[in-house]
Amino acid sequence: MTTRGFRLDQDNRLNNFAIEPEVYVDSSVQAGWTKYAEKMNGRFAMIGFASLLIMEVVTGHGVIGWLNSL
């Protein structure tokens, strides 16, 4: 039973702790080509491409030329 944000147990004792959400088990397999993995891969690729462009603008050399100068 719930009354005004407080929960009473079966013996009508007050439980003034926070009401916890229902617990569930996600039994689906989360390996391989998931949507989350694809989003993260795309985001890291965009960050890498943008950093290469910034490096080329700052140094004045392309990536291959910069690697040859090392």
From Swiss-Prot:
The chain crosses the membrane at residues 31-58. It holds the Pfam family Chloroa_b-bind. InterPro entries: Chloroa_b-bind (IPR022796). Residues 1-30 are cytoplasmic. Its main location: membrane. It comes from the Bacteria. It is found in: Cellular thylakoid membrane. It is a single-pass membrane protein. One of its GO terms (cellular component) is photosystem II. Residues 59-70 are lumenal, thylakoid. One of its GO terms (biological process) is energy quenching. Changing residue 35 to A: Increased accumulation in the absence of HliC, mutation mimics HliB. Gene3D superfamilies: Chlorophyll a/b binding protein domain. Induction: Transcription strongly induced in the absence of photosystem I (PSI), probably a monocistronic operon. Mildly increased translation in the absence of PSI (at protein level). Expressed at very low levels during growth under normal light (40 umol photons/m(2)/s), induced under high light (500 umol photons/m(2)/s for 6 hours) with maximal expression by 1 hour and decreasing after, after growth at 4 degrees Celsius for 6 hours, less induced after nitrogen or sulfur deprivation (at protein level). Upon return to normal light protein levels drop rapidly. Keywords: Membrane, Photosynthesis, Photosystem II, Pigment, Stress response, Thylakoid, Transmembrane, Transmembrane helix. A motif (Chlorophyll-binding motif) lies at residues 38-43. Disruption phenotype: Single deletion mutant and double hliA-hliB deletions are out-competed by wild-type in high light (500 umol photons/m(2)/s). Quadruple hliA-hliB-hliC-hliD deletions die rapidly in high light but grow normally in normal light (40 umol photons/m(2)/s). Quadruple mutants are sensitive to norflurazon. In a quintuple hliA-hliB-hliC-hliD-hemH deletion chlorophyll half-life decreases 2-fold while the half-life of PSII proteins does not change; photosystem II assembly intermediate RC47(1) is missing (RC47(1) is PSII monomer without CP43). De novo chlorophyll synthesis is very slow. GO terms for molecular function: chlorophyll binding; pigment binding. Belongs to the Hlip family. Forms heterodimers with HliC, these are associated with photosystem II (PSII) assembly intermediates containing CP47 (psbB). Cofractionates in an approximately 100 kDa fraction the thylakoid membrane with HliB (ScpD). Co-migrates with photosystem II (PSII); the same complex includes HliB and 3 FtsH homologs. Even in the absence of PSII, does not associate with photosystem I (PSI). HliA/HliB and Psb34 probably bind to a similar site on CP47; their binding seems to be mutually exclusive. Involved in photosystem II (PSII) assembly and/or repair under high light stress; probably important during long-term acclimation to stress. HliA-HliC heteromers associate with PSII assembly intermediates containing CP47 (psbB) and bind chlorophyll and carotenoids in a 1:0.6 ratio. They probably protect against photo-oxidation during assembly. The complex binds mostly beta-carotenoid, but minor amounts of echinenone and beta-crytoxanthin are also detected. Accumulation of this protein requires HliC. The complex efficiently quenches chlorophyll fluorescence, contributing to photoprotection. The Hlips might regulate tetrapyrrole biosynthesis, maybe at the level of aminolevulinic acid synthesis and probably stabilize PSII assembly intermediates. This is High light-inducible protein HliA. The gene is hliA.
